[in-house]
């Protein structure tokens, strides 16, 4: 279970969804069930304990046949050159293709380059790319109160599958449908904006310190 996957599982369970968390590392799952999380995130353990009757864990991929909606939530790492390693995402897609039932909906949450969803998925009528922008330290609050859902679809003009739409509507925020590539670019654009905002703030804080200004006062203004 990744940071992205576990936080989204906790958030969805809070909306009364029953969650099956898959990881091929049974030892990791056993530790998570005991409350020993592989990372620190405020309120995550609290929600997992609160909703333990709705969250189940498995290392058996055959159990995916039980799922109506399958979220692929691999944390994608990038190297110093900014190149993403998509190996694990591709492996998970292959695993889902092999074990999911034919009526299941697949939703990709991971950060991937434009055209990835269209190229690597099967049965695209039932495949969606959902933009998530969780931040370490704020993941649960952002997962529980999204500003909007950006959903990449094969046919944006069509209604979303009933179960998927019901889950999204439970968060009471706008749902923006668009084609796969537009949604994938949105994810990149949001991340670039967040990164540039941090750089911009750090630069202004440094200027304030060097010139005698008070960055806290500047921020308030």
What are these regions (language model features)?
Residues 76-139:
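Rossmann-like NAD(P)(H) cofactor-binding subdomain of soluble oxidoreductases
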Residues 52-67:
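Short acidic low-complexity segments
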Residues 99, 119-130, 134-221:
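Internal alpha-helical scaffold of NAD(P)-dependent oxidoreductase catalytic cores
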Residues 1-36, 56-59:
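NAD(P)+-binding Rossmann beta1-loop-alpha1 motif at the extreme N-terminus of oxidoreductases
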Residues 71-75, 109, 153:
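Short, well-ordered coil/turn residues at beta-beta hairpins
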Residues 48:
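Extended basic-aromatic, gly/pro-enriched interface segments that bind polyanionic ligands
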Residues 64-69, 102-104:
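Short acidic/histidine-rich motifs immediately flanking catalytic phosphotransfer sites
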């Amino acid at each position: 279970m990744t940071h992205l996957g576990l936080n989204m599982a906790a958030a969805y369970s809070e909306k009364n969804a029953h969650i099956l968390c898959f990881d091929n590392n049974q030892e990791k799952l056993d530790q998570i069930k005991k409350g020993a999380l592989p990372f620190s995130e405020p309120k995550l353990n609290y929600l997992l304990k609160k909703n333990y009757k709705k969250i189940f864990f498995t290392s058996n991929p055959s159990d995916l046949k039980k799922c109506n909606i399958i979220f692929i939530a691999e944390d994608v790492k990038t190297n110093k050159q900014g190149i993403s390693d998509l190996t694990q995402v591709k492996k998970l897609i292959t695993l889902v293709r092999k074990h999911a039932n034919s009526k299941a909906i697949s939703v990709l949450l991971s950060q991937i380059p434009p055209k990835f969803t269209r190229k690597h998925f099967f049965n695209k009528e039932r495949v969606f790319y959902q933009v998530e922008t969780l931040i370490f330290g704020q993941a649960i609050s952002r997962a529980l109160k999204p500003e909007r859902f950006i959903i990449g679809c094969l046919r944006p003009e069509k209604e979303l599958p009933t179960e998927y739409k019901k889950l999204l509507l439970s968060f009471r925020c706008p749902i923006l449908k668009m084609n796969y590539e537009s949604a994938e670019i949105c994810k990149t654009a949001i991340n670039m904006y967040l990164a540039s905002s941090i750089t911009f703030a750090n630069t202004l804080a440094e200027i304030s310190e060097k010139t005698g200004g008070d960055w806290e006062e500047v921020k308030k203004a």
